[in-house]
Amino acid sequence: MLRLDLQFFASKKGVGSTKNGRDSQSKRLGAKRADGQMVTGGSILYRQRGTKIYPGVNVGRGGDDTLYAKVDGVVRFERLGRDRKQVSVYPVAQEA
């Protein structure tokens, strides 16, 4: 006697889910002005989270730790000791 062994396979593949596949938008942090560059008062110099760079002369710190120029002048990035950096804005002398 002949025996038939029939097997049925799934005609549709099971659809799995993934926990990956998304990312947050970049926050565009970092330096916005270079050392030696001329800036006007209110210009954003550095966007950061926390105090990676500290405010120096004529530089203010916003609520989100953004550093901005308080006066017109030239940007200077400087070292404070071994492990700290600061950014300052020095006014340019006007020739009369």
Swiss-Prot record:
BP-aspect Gene Ontology terms: translation
A GO cellular-component term linked to this record: cytosolic large ribosomal subunit
Annotated region (Disordered), positions in chain: 14-35
InterPro entries assigned: Ribosomal_bL27, Ribosomal_bL27_CS
Key words, A-Z: Ribonucleoprotein, Ribosomal protein
Post-translational modification: The N-terminus is cleaved by ribosomal processing cysteine protease Prp.
Entry superkingdom: Bacteria
One example GO MF annotation: structural constituent of ribosome
Prosequence residues removed at maturation: 1-9
Similarity field: Belongs to the bacterial ribosomal protein bL27 family.
NCBIfam families for the chain: L27
PANTHER family: LARGE RIBOSOMAL SUBUNIT PROTEIN BL27M, RIBOSOMAL PROTEIN L27
Stated name of the protein: Large ribosomal subunit protein bL27
Organism per entry: Bacillus cytotoxicus (strain DSM 22905 / CIP 110041 / 391-98 / NVH 391-98)
